[in-house]
């Protein structure tokens, strides 16, 4: 009979440790104020905008500083949330860090010179700058 209670205690201890490990392995959510939601906060709209525009797992309205209700997005802490304000779905992405967008795929025309003048029509070199 005593051996049975030792086995029961050992199984119970293993079970408790396993439950603790499952909770630790679960993803933890990080809260961040929405960058795209404005106006009176509505939970359904906040949730939808956080998921679709900010790639969050969830969104909800909460009162924080000064009693104002704001939309908060919840991200998986193991992944980093988007840094910049995302573009709406279907919009063209912003230019690369260099500042100017890449030329069109079909060739297109070269970008204008940095000094603001227009490029020569024949494709030759531009005239020298004036001295006056």
Curated annotation (Swiss-Prot):
Phenotype upon changing residue 71 to S: Loss of IgE reactivity
Phenotype when changing residue 46 to S: Loss of IgE reactivity
Cellular component annotations (GO), alphabetically ordered: extracellular region
Signal peptide: 1-24
Gene Ontology MF terms in the entry: molecular function activator activity
Post-translational modification: The mature protein extracted from the plant exhibits an average rate of 76% of hydroxyprolines. O-glycosylated. O-linkage of 3 galactoses plus 9-16 or 21-23 arabinose residues attached on one or two hydroxyprolines.
BP terms from Gene Ontology: defense response
Summary of the protein's practical applications: Post-translational modifications do not seem to influence T-cell recognition. Thus, recombinant non-glycosylated Art v 1 could be a starting template for engineering hypoallergenic vaccines for weed-pollen therapy. Optimization of codon usage is required for effective genetic immunization against Art v 1 and should be considered in the development of vaccines for the treatment of allergy.
Annotated region (Epitope recognized by IgE antibodies of mugwort pollen-sensitized patients), positions in chain: 64-70, 79-87
Taxonomy, superkingdom: Eukaryota
Low complexity composition-biased segments: 115-124
SUPFAM superfamilies, A to Z: Scorpion toxin-like
Region (Disordered): 81-132
Swiss-Prot/TrEMBL keywords: Allergen, Disulfide bond, Glycoprotein, Secreted, Signal
Residue ranges with Pro residues bias: 83-114
Region annotation (Defensin-like domain) ranges: 28-77
InterPro entries named in the record: Scorpion_toxin-like, Scorpion_toxin-like_sf
Domain notes from UniProt: Contains several extensin-like repeats in the C-terminal section.
Family membership: In the N-terminal section; belongs to the DEFL family.
Record protein name field: Major pollen allergen Art v 1
Gene source species: Artemisia vulgaris (Mugwort)
């Amino acid at each position: 009979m005593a051996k049975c209670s030792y086995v029961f205690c050992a199984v119970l201890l293993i079970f408790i440790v396993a439950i603790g490990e499952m909770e630790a392995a679960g993803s933890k959510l990080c809260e961040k104020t929405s960058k795209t939601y404005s106006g009176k906060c509505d939970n359904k709209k906040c949730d939808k905008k956080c998921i679709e525009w900010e790639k969050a797992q969830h969104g909800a309205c909460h009162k924080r500083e000064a009693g104002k209700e704001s939309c908060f997005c919840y991200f998986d802490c193991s992944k980093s949330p988007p840094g910049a304000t995302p573009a709406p779905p279907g919009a063209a992405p912003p230019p690369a860090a260099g500042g100017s967008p890449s030329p069109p795929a079909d060739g297109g025309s070269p970008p204008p010179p940095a000094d603001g003048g227009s490029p020569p029509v024949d494709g030759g070199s531009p005239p020298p700058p004036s001295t006056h």
